């Protein structure tokens, strides 16, 4: 029997605020995930969202300033919505939405409320922590990326430099101020415990989920995208998702070059990110006949494009274990696809692929090992098929309902243990 959710009184459910740059109608990962979590909890809590106008995939769409959607009260705070692909524009967007969210939150949040915030953009959790402290709310920190580790692993900051050390000091205080820290995997829990000095008792592992109803394996020969691109007769290796500094696309470019003479193998990229222009330029520079780079596809088209391959590849640079857990992994599993995981051996991604026998694990940066994994997958169609079946079975264990239930238990535990203020 499900434990009753915490309530401020028998008549009125406790308020749960969600602070996020991205929310519906944004379909990018963070916006989609926060929307589903908020709506899933709206049957038990008075859920209220403070967010921005669309600046990512839905940029240009002017959403209502205030609305109630699926039981959630949404307030879209004013900010700039400039083209985020221009770095200075992205910075302006972040700074204006941070200021706007703080202004609305400081007059809206009350003592005893819950305040859920995600770690992206990295300034936002500090704003939420300030509001929680001033207003007497309980801060819930949802970790999608660990800072400054994500910046040092990608080479954007020297690991031992002054700025990285200062950010570490600030982050440690942020994490220690949270009533609960929610992480996406076992490796992330270990990192937060050691790097941030947070007790394991105050950390909850709540993974993301697979949309197993909308996404499932389909017949390859009938895949519309493969037909459109003329790839029905190719062995297709797909990379779908963000293409950022942490994703080690350089080793993929090397693998494509080494396999260029193999006319049966084709690399299909779908997504966007800061490294996408570099990848497109590299494909042109090397005149690779075995690669195609496409832009973002609507979330509603995932059934089609996630099935448009024989195997998927997820890559990270070295040092990303515990720093980030790829949300794309779960829907890839739902599509019944094996995975080549280019990742640290102790990362959540690598451990899952290895323990569940879902594909191949390759150390970051090892181009030759990627080539060998692709060739091994192509030579063993029956093994690949078995991996796909196991992938689908694993995906069934990661449902949205189980995630929402985990959040309910977390919130109930806070109140029953007397950790709530006020």
Locations of the language-model features?
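N-terminal subdomain of nucleotide-sugar transferases
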Residues: 1-73, 259, 402, 422
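Carbohydrate-associated surface elements
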Residues: 53, 187, 206-209
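A short helix/loop element that forms part of the nucleotide-sugar donor recognition site in Leloir-type
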Residues: 62-66, 216-230
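Conserved donor-binding/catalytic core segment of Leloir-type glycosyltransferases
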Residues: 231-247, 253-256, 268
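A short, well-ordered alpha-helix in the C-terminal region of glycosyltransferases
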Residues: 234, 376, 383-397
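Nucleotide-sugar-dependent
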Residues: 247, 296-305, 312-333, 339-351
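Nucleotide-activated donor-binding/catalytic signature segment of Leloir-type glycosyltransferases, i.e.
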Residues: 264, 270-271, 276-303
